[in-house]
């Protein structure tokens, strides 16, 4: 599964071509300290109406070995880590050895946390904020 950040300089149509592929989990960036959307983040939808980004992930003031970093690369890295943990549970631990990228994308969308008062999906948050625990909880409800 590919994970692609959604950064581009045009604020109205800021998604690059790889983030439109059906197998890609496309993420925007938000500030987890106050749950605000990061203004520099990419946003969508696609030119043909695809709903992207799929999710928004933390990407502001992220602690790294080199200090605090901010940006869509941080959000993409955090999402990649969440997907890796999901693959560990799914494939390595044998809970769903045949999991495919579209199915996994669907689980993450179902587990997304949504803010009351906002309509989803939307151009900034997609289907909501990445939440791995809620993704696993969504699996229990399937």
Give the location of each predicted region.
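Mixed-charge, polar/low-complexity N-terminal
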Residues: 5-7, 27, 36, 103-105, ...
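Extracellular S/T/G-rich loop segment that most often corresponds to the catalytic His/Ser-adjacent loop
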Residues: 7-88
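Hydrolase catalytic cores
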Residues: 59-120, 129, 137
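Short polybasic/polar patches that bind polyanions
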Residues: 123
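Conserved active-site-adjacent core of cysteine acyl-enzyme catalytic domains
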Residues: 126
């Amino acid at each position: 599964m590919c994970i692609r950040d959604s950064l581009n300089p045009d604020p109205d149509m800021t998604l690059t071509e790889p983030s439109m592929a059906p197998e890609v989990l496309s993420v925007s960036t938000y500030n987890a300290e106050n749950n605000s959307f990061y203004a520099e983040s990419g946003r969508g939808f696609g030119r043909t109406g695809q709903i992207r980004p799929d999710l928004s992930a933390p990407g502001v003031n992220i602690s790294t070995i080199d200090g605090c970093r901010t940006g869509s690369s941080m959000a993409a890295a955090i999402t990649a880590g969440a997907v890796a943990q999901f693959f560990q549970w799914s494939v390595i631990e044998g809970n769903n050895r045949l999991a495919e990228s579209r199915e996994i994308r669907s689980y993450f969308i179902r587990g997304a946390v949504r803010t009351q008062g906002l309509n989803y999906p939307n151009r900034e948050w997609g289907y909501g904020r990445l939440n791995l625990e809620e993704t696993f909880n969504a699996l229990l409800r399937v």
